[in-house]
Every structure is written in structure tokens, then in C-alpha cells.
Swiss-Prot record:
Entries under InterPro entries matching the protein: NADH_UbQ_OxRdtase (IPR003918), ND/Mrp_TM (IPR001750)
Species the sequence originates in: Calloselasma rhodostoma (Malayan pit viper)
Catalytic activity: a ubiquinone + NADH + 5 H(+)(in) = a ubiquinol + NAD(+) + 4 H(+)(out)
Name under which the protein is recorded: NADH-ubiquinone oxidoreductase chain 4
Main location: mitochondrion
Enzyme class, UniProt record, top EC level: translocase
Entry keyword Transmembrane helix: yes
């Protein structure tokens, strides 16, 4: 059920990040070097999850692994126990909650029309449903963390915090963000570009689907304009 996936990615997955925040309060704040293996594991997990995304042919699995990779960045940012890291982790949890929920919603609208989640079989929607293609583009740009979205603010905070804490982490951070951009563009091109399905009568977009996407995207843009509400 798509509602379960949306709630799982947007809310329940972020409870793990909240648990890390609470656990870090009882850890020493001075000797953060002891957390270096945990930070490396979190970032390496994010890179591996991103590489797994590149191998996926199932649209829903790709979005699910994308959520895991972003939580790796959140975990690394929270573990170092700096104000910027904590702000970036919390902001990314909120931003990616909206983004992953929107991606699952779009995947479901595609599935309702094609009855398949295989990427190569869902192509050609830019000619049939141009408005849905616009939503796909905006949501993937949010997933890549392009300005002026809240995702950009959060990833900038996380990158600054981790780089100030240990400059070497920029290697895995940069690799993770590069792969994120790669699979996001791959997901957009695979689902929207190419020849449309010839034997499939596609029903038009409904207003409720557009309203759902507006309610996912508008909060992110509004929060980025007044980011001091979170940071």
C-alpha cells in the first residue's frame, strides 16, 4: 500500500534519527574522536545505499534505498555533536520526509497507469502527462538538493559540519552526493523520456494528485525561505 510507504519513509524512518539525537545527549561531547568509526560507517553506508540505487530496476525499491542513504548522512551529522551538525541532521530529516513521500506518491500514480514498477516499462510520460513530468522533475531536483529547497540548506550544513570536524569526510560526502544526482536523473529520464507505451490507454491526471504534490513541495520551499524555524 502506497500510504504505508509514504508514512514509513516520511515519519517512521525519522524516528531512528530522533533516537540517535536522544542517545547522543548521554555521550561525552569533548572526546568526539571516539565516534570517528561510527561516522565513517554511516557515510560508507550512505555511499553503498546510493550505489544500490543505481542497480535498481524497481521504482519503489530505488526510492526506498534513497531514503536509507539520506539517513546515513543524518546519522553522521548527529554523531559528531556540533550545533551545525544537529541542525543539518534535523533539517534533512524534515526535508527528506517530504521528498521521499512525494516520490512514493508519484511512483504510485505511475503504477496506477502502467501496472508495473519496472523503470524501463514506465517511460514516455512526458508526452502523455506533462504536468506529472513537471512534478517528477521538481521532486528529483529536491532529492538532489538543489537551491532554494530545504534539502540544499540541510546538506550544506551537514557538509560544513563534517568538513570542519574531519576534512577527509568530504571524499565520501562528495561521492554520495554525486551518486545521488546520478540515480535521481536516471530515475527521471527512465520514467518520463523515451517513446510512450503504444498499447496502454492512460487516464489523465486528477486534481487530487496535483494537490498532493503541491502540499509536499510548497512546505519545503516555504521552510527554506524562513529556515530559522528549524535551524
Amino acid at each position: 500500500p502506497i500510504a504505508g510507504s509514504m508514512v514509513l519513509a516520511a515519519i517512521l524512518l525519522k524516528l531512528g534519527g530522533y533516537g540517535i539525537i536522544r542517545m547522543m545527549q548521554i555521550m561525552p561531547t569533548t572526546k568526539t574522536d571516539m565516534f570517528l568509526p561510527l561516522v565513517v560507517l554511516a557515510l560508507w553506508g550512505a555511499v553503498l545505499a546510493n550505489l544500490t540505487c543505481l542497480q535498481q530496476t524497481d521504482l519503489k525499491s530505488l526510492i526506498a534505498y534513497s531514503s536509507i542513504s539520506h539517513m546515513g548522512l543524518v546519522a553522521a551529522a548527529i554523531i559528531i555533536q556540533t550545533p551545525w551538525g544537529l541542525s543539518g541532521g534535523m533539517t534533512l530529516m524534515i526535508a527528506h520526509g517530504f521528498t521521499s513521500s512525494a516520490l512514493f506518491c508519484l511512483a504510485n500514480t505511475t503504477y496506477e497507469r502502467t501496472h508495473t514498477r519496472i523503470l524501463i516499462l514506465t517511460r514516455g510520460f512526458h508526452n502523455i502527462l506533462p504536468m506529472a513530468t513537471t512534478w517528477w522533475l521538481l521532486t528529483n531536483l529536491m532529492n538532489i538538493a538543489t537551491p532554494p529547497t530545504t534539502n540544499f540548506t540541510s546538506e550544506l550544513l551537514i557538509m560544513s559540519a563534517l568538513f570542519n570536524w574531519c576534512p577527509t569526510t568530504i571524499i565520501m560526502l562528495g561521492l554520495s552526493m554525486l551518486i545521488t544526482a546520478s540515480y535521481s536523473l536516471h530515475m527521471f529520464l527512465s520514467t518520463q523520456m523515451g517513446p510512450p507505451p503504444s498499447n496502454n490507454l492512460t487516464e489523465p491526471s486528477h486534481s487530487r494528485e496535483h494537490l498532493l504534490m503541491i502540499l509536499h513541495i510548497m512546505p519545503l520551499l516555504m521552510i527554506s525561505l524562513k529556515s530559522e524555524l528549524i535551524i
